[in-house]
Amino acid sequence: YPTELTSISLPRMLAIRDMMPSLSNFGISDHSLGTSMAKVAVVHGAHWIEKHFTIDRDIPGPDNRMSMLPHEIREIRSFCDDFSKMSTGNRMEPTAAETDLRKIIVGRFGDNS
């Protein structure tokens, strides 16, 4: 404790996930410092993250040193929400904002398509 990032093998984690295609979801038990591993796991499809939580890393105990603080949980939650927004749908048509911007550019510089 804590797990060093150099001791984490993302390829091994993904290989284990791929060995069990019948599982409907997978997750990680993360004992590293910070939020990087949790975010990487989400990007690769993790449905759950197990991570210790504390309100004070100075409280005695073996897990507090590597436990997440409240602001780190909010950071991961925000990342998950943002990632979900970017990953939802299979839209190829321009958004309303892109269409409006195109009209401004075409109006100013002409249509060069």
What positions do the PLM features span?
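Catalytic cores and adjacent flexible loops of soluble metabolic enzymes
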Residues: 1-113
